[in-house]
Amino acid sequence: MNKQIDLPIADVQGSLDTRHIAIDRVGIKAIRHPVVVADKGGGSQHTVAQFNMYVNLPHNFKGTHMSRFVEILNSHEREISVESFEEILRSMVSRLESDSGHIEMAFPYFINKSAPVSGVKSLLDYEVTFIGEIKHGNQYSFTMKVIVPVTSLCPCSKKISDYGAHNQRSHVTISVRTNSFIWIEDIIRIAEEQASCELYGLLKRPDEKYVTERAYNNPKFVEDIVRDVAEVLNHDDRIDAYIVESENFESIHNHSAYALIERDKRIR
């Protein structure tokens, strides 16, 4: 019987690439993984996040080691927070032997809200994304992005109509870079308080009357919403930079109204 000879398996990814063109981002995209996220109430939420994970690739390497991205995710089963998110990113850059890295973690986040009159409780979901980036081996930046569904009511429609006004569901998207800790709930409240009215998962008839009249008494253009949110963010010392967007899904048109304000408060 011939004896089997174990030969080393070639590392194709680590071989030399002769084109000498560096790649800015390479990795895995849209991989789902269970996570645990801390909430402001002192508890935590078990949810499923979708990850995009990338590193840079020097010009002399043929490829990156894709399996290592999954191994890194599997090694972080514990609670994920703003602080541990940086740890995951740094371990990825180190493990892949790169100078820069980028991770996006998008997940649904739930808040148990009380209806404004009846007090009945129900969950409402929000879209949250953590975005972390390391450049030049050490420079770390973190962005939190939250999409908040709200109600907007048109001031012009109210002004020119004998009764009623068109209103619609809107998305207020706030992306912030901070210098100190800020809860997801804090960002959500900023958006909801500047809308014509906030949304609820469950409403009884007295609640429905309240939110209808609340929106009617608080009409806002898409421009009003982004300006009002920006004004709050300008006065929040925890926030260094932000992008605030508002998209109104117009009920009387087959298109949306949209506005955006971007500011880096560190630049005078």
Swiss-Prot record:
Documented EC number(s): 3.5.4.16
Gene3D superfamilies: Urate Oxidase
Pfam families linked: GCHY-1
Catalysed reactions, semicolon-separated: GTP + H2O = 7,8-dihydroneopterin 3'-triphosphate + formate + H(+)
Record pathway: Cofactor biosynthesis; 7,8-dihydroneopterin triphosphate biosynthesis; 7,8-dihydroneopterin triphosphate from GTP: step 1/1
Class in the EC hierarchy, top level: hydrolase
Site feature May be catalytically important, where: 154
GO biological-process terms attached to the record: tetrahydrofolate biosynthetic process
A single GO molecular function term of this UniProt record: GTP cyclohydrolase I activity
Keyword list, A-Z: Hydrolase
Family: Belongs to the GTP cyclohydrolase IV family.
Function: Converts GTP to 7,8-dihydroneopterin triphosphate.
PANTHER family attached to this UniProt entry: GTP CYCLOHYDROLASE MPTA
Protein name in UniProt: GTP cyclohydrolase FolE2
